[in-house]
């Protein structure tokens, strides 16, 4: 069964990133901007407002993605706390996993009430809004690497993003990275939308993202995990 699922996703994934050049997101983006600061307590109402006026799956998902990127901020204090815990428990994944589960309630509360979160919150919010619009969306846990993350020493996943199925094809996206950047010098999150992580080409995406479940690579051209982590 798993082999069948792998082949199904891989076949669809090979086409991901193709056929999107003629899609206009102007209407979806304008709708996303109509609801700044909309309460997440009324999440279904938000999903309906963002997607009902739009005719296609890709436009509906674009409106959801853009709204999240424009209205949700990375919580700097939470980001630092999680980073510190990862460092402290870098050799004890069981302890870190226990802390993460215990801390999840605070993460959800912060997201719903303050519109702030970290990667886990971004990816779960994208998924929930998409599912409310009848769009198949999956949270992908795995490893990421950038200038802020010491990836070589990673022993458990350190990031989350999404896979979304649109028109029977799977695509990858990372709303955390699309929404802005962390400026450590000022200890602030700087909103700065980056479209590069929206429905990205899997061959490009894998340069910075490696899923725990390799089904979600969506490409057969990729490094091994050890190569990705720089251990080889």
Residue map of PLM features:
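Sec-dependent N-terminal signal peptides
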Residues: 3-13
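Hydrophobic/aromatic-rich core segments of domains that either
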Residues: 121-203
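Secondary-structure boundary elements
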Residues: 19-117
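A generic secondary-structure signal for well-formed alpha-helical elements
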Residues: 12, 68, 72-76, 133-137, ...
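Residues embedded in well-ordered secondary-structure elements
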Residues: 6, 53, 151-153
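Alpha-helical and coiled-coil interaction segments, frequently adjacent to or embedded
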Residues: 183-232
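A generic structural signal for short coil/turn motifs at secondary-structure boundaries
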Residues: 13, 17, 148-150
């Amino acid at each position: 069964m798993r082999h069948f699922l792998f082949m199904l996703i891989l076949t669809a994934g090979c086409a991901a990133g193709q056929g999107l050049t003629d899609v206009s997101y102007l209407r979806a983006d304008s709708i996303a901007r109509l609801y700044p600061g909309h309460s997440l307590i009324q999440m279904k109402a938000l999903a309906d407002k963002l997607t009902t006026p739009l005719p296609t799956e890709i436009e509906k998902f674009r409106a959801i993605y853009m709204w999240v990127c424009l209205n949700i901020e990375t919580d700097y204090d939470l980001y630092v706390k999680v980073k510190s815990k990862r460092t402290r428990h870098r050799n004890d994944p069981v302890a870190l996993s226990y802390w993460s589960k215990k801390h999840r309630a605070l993460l959800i509360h912060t997201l719903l009430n303050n519109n702030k979160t970290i990667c886990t919150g971004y990816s779960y919010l994208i998924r929930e809004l998409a599912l409310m619009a009848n769009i198949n969306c999956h949270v992908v846990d795995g490893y990421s690497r950038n200038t802020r993350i010491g990836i070589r020493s990673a022993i458990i996943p350190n990031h989350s993003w999404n896979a979304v199925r649109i028109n029977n094809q799977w695509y990858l996206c990372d709303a955390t990275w699309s929404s802005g950047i962390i400026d450590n010098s000022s200890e602030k999150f700087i909103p700065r939308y980056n479209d590069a992580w929206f429905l990205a080409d899997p061959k490009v995406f894998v340069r910075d993202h490696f899923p725990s479940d390799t089904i979600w690579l969506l490409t057969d051209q990729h490094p091994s995990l050890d190569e990705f982590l720089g251990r080889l």
